[in-house]
């Protein structure tokens, strides 16, 4: 391997990516190896490096010190001529004066044998700590939001006007496509397939704690938003085919049983647990179809393009079947897609950029209400989480062929 001082800018960029510091690739795109090892703390107090990381570049500087030691770079060389260092010695002469006699010091290449103190970087914690306690809190948050949603559906159901009094609102999609009775079952089957694929993929992920924590935070927030939108505006049923459950008129015991039945059935019509009306704005089915696809694509290798396309088709067909069944207004689906994709992209943009994890006047994303919980969940995650997989089960993997293809331990990102 070439010494660091001879590295090209491309080699420097590759080294940054290998060490999970992609945020430095753009500011250091023209840096050679010599420029890299010459970086000091002062460089991180000036633009553009001062805007990259919240730790003043300490992690990168520690990695550079480690790199110097790995390649035996000597930071404190004494610049002497080649060969043995000649030392001048005063020798008295017969006339009482002194002459200088040159003696070699016996050290090759003219270096003095001196003790050099090399700063050793402190042993830092893992860049991607699991922190299962935080993941459990995120799970409780998502579970609470899901339970609150079922309670809100039961409350809103009591306010939905009868379809004979308030007919369905006009909808452009309904004007062009007649209702297909079995379409909503296709939607829910696609959703269950996507959730199953995501669960299998999650089990094989190396950093499953971090990724599941992100999933719970996002899905919990989406269902919390849904509680608000369905409560503040109650829309009439989107079709005359709806047969809503009878209203209970304050019978809290019956409402509690209905809520428990809805939770046990996962809120799905295909399980017979969901026969209430009013939970239209916005579509929870669209949320799950969209969010599972986004997580599947984000945390799987780019080379599995066929897998991404299959999941995308399942998601798109499922969303189309929601409308084809006339079980949601078009605006319900549009709003659900918009909120889901934006929240997913905002969260991951903030999680992948260290500078966005620190509140400042320049960071406008720090003004969202969920920024403090975000900081708590993500503050110890350094950089982009690799798409790394491992076998989580005690029994070994069975190879179907004698020819084993070796690949990098870390999956392509």
From Swiss-Prot:
CDD domains: PAP2_like (cd01610), SAM_SGMS1 (cd09514). It holds the Pfam family PAP2_C. The chain crosses the membrane at residues 136-156, 184-204, 215-235, 276-296, 304-324. One of its GO terms (biological process) is regulation of intrinsic apoptotic signaling pathway. GO terms for cellular component: endoplasmic reticulum; endoplasmic reticulum membrane; Golgi membrane; Golgi trans cisterna; membrane; nucleus; plasma membrane. InterPro entries: SAM (IPR001660), SAM/pointed_sf (IPR013761), Sphingomyelin_synth-like (IPR045221), Sphingomyelin_synth-like_dom (IPR025749). Inhibited by bacterial PC-phospholipase C inhibitor D609. Residues 7-70 form the SAM domain. It is found in: Golgi apparatus membrane. Residues 325-413 are cytoplasmic. Its EC number is 2.7.8.27. It catalyses: an N-acylsphing-4-enine + a 1,2-diacyl-sn-glycero-3-phosphocholine = a sphingomyelin + a 1,2-diacyl-sn-glycerol; an N-acylsphinganine + a 1,2-diacyl-sn-glycero-3-phosphocholine = an N-acylsphinganine-1-phosphocholine + a 1,2-diacyl-sn-glycerol; an N-acyl-(4R)-4-hydroxysphinganine + a 1,2-diacyl-sn-glycero-3-phosphocholine = an N-acyl-(4R)-4-hydroxysphinganine-phosphocholine + a 1,2-diacyl-sn-glycerol; 1-(9Z-octadecenoyl)-2-acyl-sn-3-glycerol + a sphingomyelin = a 1-(9Z-octadecenoyl)-2-acyl-sn-glycero-3-phosphocholine + an N-acylsphing-4-enine. Pathway: Sphingolipid metabolism. Brain, heart, kidney, liver, muscle and stomach. SUPFAM superfamilies: SAM/Pointed domain. Belongs to the sphingomyelin synthase family. Major sphingomyelin synthase at the Golgi apparatus. Catalyzes the reversible transfer of phosphocholine moiety in sphingomyelin biosynthesis: in the forward reaction transfers phosphocholine head group of phosphatidylcholine (PC) on to ceramide (CER) to form ceramide phosphocholine (sphingomyelin, SM) and diacylglycerol (DAG) as by-product, and in the reverse reaction transfers phosphocholine from SM to DAG to form PC and CER. The direction of the reaction depends on the levels of CER and DAG in Golgi membranes. This is Phosphatidylcholine:ceramide cholinephosphotransferase 1. It comes from Homo sapiens (Human). The gene is SGMS1.
């Amino acid at each position: 391997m070439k010494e660091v001082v001879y590295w090209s800018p491309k080699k420097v960029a590759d080294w940054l990516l290998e060490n999970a510091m992609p945020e430095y690739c753009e500011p250091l795109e023209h840096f050679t190896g010599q420029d890299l090892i010459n970086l000091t703390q002062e460089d991180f107090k000036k633009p553009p490096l001062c805007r990259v990381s919240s730790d003043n570049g300490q992690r990168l500087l520690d990695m550079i010190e480690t790199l110097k030691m790995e390649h035996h770079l000597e930071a404190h060389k004494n610049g002497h001529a080649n060969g043995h260092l000649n030392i001048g010695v005063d020798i008295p002469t017969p006339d009482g004066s002194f002459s200088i006699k040159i003696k070699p010091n016996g050290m090759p290449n003219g270096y003095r044998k001196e003790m050099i103190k090399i700063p050793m970087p402190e042993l830092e914690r893992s860049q991607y700590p699991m922190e299962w306690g935080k993941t459990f809190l995120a799970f409780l948050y998502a579970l609470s939001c899901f339970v609150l949603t079922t309670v809100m559906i039961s409350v809103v159901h009591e306010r939905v006007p009868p379809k004979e009094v308030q007919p369905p609102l006009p909808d452009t999609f309904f004007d062009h496509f007649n209702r297909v009775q079995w379409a909503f079952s296709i939607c829910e089957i696609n959703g269950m397939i996507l959730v199953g694929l995501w669960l299998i993929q999650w089990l094989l992920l190396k950093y499953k704690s971090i990724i599941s924590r992100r999933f719970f935070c996002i899905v919990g927030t989406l269902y919390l938003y849904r509680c608000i939108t369905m409560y503040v505006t109650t829309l009439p049923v989107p079709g005359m085919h709806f047969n809503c459950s009878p209203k209970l008129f304050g019978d809290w015991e019956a409402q509690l049983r209905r809520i428990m039945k809805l939770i046990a059935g996962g809120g799905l019509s295909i399980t017979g647990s969901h026969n209430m009306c009013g939970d239209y704005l916005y579509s929870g089915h669209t949320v799950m179809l969209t969010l599972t696809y986004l997580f599947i694509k984000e945390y799987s290798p780019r080379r599995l393009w066929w897998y991404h396309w299959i999941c995308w088709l399942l998601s798109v067909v499922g969303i189309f079947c929601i409308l084809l069944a006339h079980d949601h207004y078009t605006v319900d689906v549009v709003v659900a897609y918009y909120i889901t994709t934006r929240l997913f992209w905002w969260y991951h943009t903030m999680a992948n950029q260290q500078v966005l994890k620190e509140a400042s006047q320049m960071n406008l994303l720090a003004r969202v209400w969920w920024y403090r919980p975000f900081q708590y969940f993500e503050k110890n995650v350094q950089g982009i989480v690799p798409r790394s997989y491992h076998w989580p089960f005690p029994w070994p993997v069975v190879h179907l062929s004698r020819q084993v293809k070796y690949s990098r331990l870390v999956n392509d990102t």
